Curated annotation (Swiss-Prot):
Keyword terms: Cytoplasm, Queuosine biosynthesis, S-adenosyl-L-methionine, Transferase
E.C. numbers: 2.4.99.17
Record's protein name: S-adenosylmethionine:tRNA ribosyltransferase-isomerase
Lineage start: Bacteria, Bacillati, Bacillota, Bacilli, Lactobacillales
Catalytic activity: 7-aminomethyl-7-carbaguanosine(34) in tRNA + S-adenosyl-L-methionine = epoxyqueuosine(34) in tRNA + adenine + L-methionine + 2 H(+)
NCBIfam families (alphabetical): PRK00147.1, queA
Keyword Transferase part of the UniProt annotation: yes
Organism: Streptococcus agalactiae serotype V (strain ATCC BAA-611 / 2603 V/R)
Length: 342
């Protein structure tokens, strides 16, 4: 298949720049790929789509304030670092701007020296490995000095950084939010649980690769970025029991889908406690092994995320749904509206 097969017209004004005042006030497009039906709804009605005995699976990763602005100690030139992943100890892989001035041994100071980054290795595409030195606890220093790494298509300043976290965010490590989860409130989750739906959490730390465009025409040549995931034994046992009793596995977002399908592919459709790195690329032709339904936001044209949704619901039907969303003025991307796919 070709990347252009997943293109669609999207007016720029439909890209949501700020979150709605109420998380669950967003619109919800419910699409049923078997019956080829579409229903316009609101997100708090997702309760109607969930049945007693189902499991709702959410990614509890927490976004780090991973964008740091500092200056080189020798020249005082401005430097921007974006933390991508913790490689070991105080060493991090980062994306640096301007990268060409940051050679091995270069020191960058943040917050009047409260945090120092020393470049230990040069990588391609502006990547660097740096080692941080600081007093106290690294995450506390980062919380005070760092900024939220909002996606490149969001140009408005985020007034409340909690709005780029899910209400159940717990495990530090993401460079971007698992945005399908931003719509849930604690009250809505309580109602879902009261209905007899199991709430299950896994972790996948979202990397910046989630925003990288597909740069090849032939999808078979595209290589996905790797992201760290983890599923506990308790969560795996709960999900297997739900499956065995006839309930559905309903994933919140593409990160939850990719984690579940990675593990299901390893263990013949069964779920087991597991952790590691995944670069699974779910595109049309993929046979789903675990996920029965899911919620997700509206994604970028020609993105791997549109391809994932198309793998589940069919490309033509998904593009039809996207065109409907454009006509009905749904809001797109991270702070936008949602889709429930069954």
């Amino acid at each position: 298949m070709n990347t252009n097969d997943f293109d669609f017209y999207l007016p720029e004004e439909l890209i949501a720049q700020t979150p709605l005042e109420k998380r669950d006030a967003s619109k919800l497009l419910v699409i049923d790929h078997k019956n080829k039906t579409m229903t316009d709804s609101h997100f708090d009605h997702i309760l109607d789509e969930l049945k007693p005995g189902d499991a709702l699976v959410m990614n509890n990763t927490r976004v780090l304030p991973a964008r740091l602005y500092g200056e080189k100690q020798d020249t005082h030139g401005h430097v921007e670092l974006l933390l991508l992943k913790n490689t070991e100890g105080d060493q991090w892989e980062v994306l640096a701007k301007p990268a060409k001035r940051l050679r091995v041994g270069t020191k960058v100071s943040f917050g009047d020296g409260r945090l120092i980054a020393t470049v230990t290795k040069e990588l391609e595409h502006g990547g660097r490995i740096v080692e941080f030195s600081y007093d106290g606890i690294f995450l506390e220093v980062l919380e005070s000095l760092g900024e939220m790494p909002l996606p490149p298509y969001i140009h408005e300043k985020l007034e409340d950084r909690d709005r780029y976290q899910t209400v159940y965010a717990k495990e530090n490590g993401s460079a971007a939010a698992p945005t399908a989860g931003l719509h849930f409130t604690k009250e809505l989750l309580e109602k879902i649980e009261t209905k007899g739906v199991k709430l299950v959490y896994l972790t996948l730390h979202v990397g910046l690769g989630t925003f990288r465009p597909v740069s090849v025409d032939n999808l078979d040549e595209h290589e996905m970025h790797s992201e760290f995931y983890q599923l506990s034994k308790e969560a795996a046992d709960t999900l297997n029991a739900v499956k065995e009793s006839g309930g559905r596995i309903v994933a919140v977002g593409t990160t939850s889908i990719r984690t579940l399908e990675t593990i299901g592919s390893k263990f013949n459709g069964e779920l087991k406690a597991d952790s590691g790195w995944t670069n699974i690329f779910i595109k049309p032709g993929y046979q789903f092994k675990v996920v029965d339904a899911f919620s997700t936001n509206f994604h970028l044209p020609k993105s791997t995320l549109v391809m994932l949704v198309s793998a589940f619901a069919g490309r033509d039907f998904v593009l039809e749904a996207y065109n409907h969303a454009v006509e009905e003025r749904y809001r797109f991307f991270s702070f936008g509206d949602a889709m429930f796919v069954k």
